[in-house]
Amino acid sequence: MDTSLKNNDGASEADNKNYQDYKDESGNINDVINAIKHNSMVDCCHKNYSTFSSEWYMNERKYDDIAEGPSPKKSVVHRCTII
């Protein structure tokens, strides 16, 4: 699965969705904030690493970065900080 971003057109769409979620579900603000944090981390990791596995550790804010190529030898854990 190619998760690299050739351009960042999706960023404004994600921002719009985050705002819409906030407007529509102001009573569930904690859930919305958590979703925004998750989306921000995905965006951060997309920008900094071209590929990553689907295994997320949300509480520890880390994921396994899989090297590109036909047979990656090991996974390297990177941390992605939400600003």
From Swiss-Prot:
Instruction: Give the main localization category.
Output: host cell
Task: Cite the entry's keywords alphabetically.
Answer: Early protein, Host cytoplasm, Host-virus interaction
Q: What induces it?
A: Expressed in the early phase of the viral replicative cycle.
List compositional bias (Basic and acidic residues) regions by residue number. Answer: 14-25
**Which GO CC terms are listed, alphabetically?**
host cell cytoplasm
The question of whether Protein biosynthesis is a record keyword is answered with no
Polar residues composition bias: residue spans: 1-10
The superkingdom listed in its UniProt entry is Viruses
Protein location: Host cytoplasm
Region (Disordered) spans which residues? 1-25
Q: Does the keyword Lipid metabolism apply?
A: no
The subunit structure is:
Interacts with host IL1B.
The task this protein performs is described as: May subvert the host innate immune response by interacting with host IL1B and interfering with its function.
- Indicate the family of this protein: Belongs to the asfivirus L83L family.
Q: What is this protein called?
A: Protein L83L
